[in-house]
Amino acid sequence: MMGILDELRGLSAAEDFFRTLGVKYDAEVLNVARLHILRRMGTYLSQAELEPDEDAARAQCRAQLQRAYDDFTRSTPIAERVFKVHRDAVRPSGGFVSLSELTQDGT
């Protein structure tokens, strides 16, 4: 018998994960954050101890995919910083720059 993790490993498209686990999604959200959602789901699953019962394990996977998806319905991939390239990027300082600093001629 194939376990849920083996089944998920055989999937390639993000939409397949959502269909397999029965999680509803907005195509616009998925088109922008598909890799981020799946990576976040993987992080959540790696922190969880899956139940030995197949139905319970499937429910856990479904819940973690839903949780990861929800993260990106409320935020953006850049703000969530799932991938190293985003984590290493310099965060905007949000500091104030006065108009006089922008218009000084160097004197």
Swiss-Prot record:
Signal peptide: none annotated. The keyword Mitochondrion does not apply. Pfam families: NifW. The keyword tRNA processing does not apply. InterPro entries: NifW. Keywords: Nitrogen fixation. GO terms for biological process: nitrogen fixation. May protect the nitrogenase Fe-Mo protein from oxidative damage. Homotrimer; associates with NifD. Belongs to the NifW family. NCBIfam families: PRK00810.1. This is Nitrogenase-stabilizing/protective protein NifW.
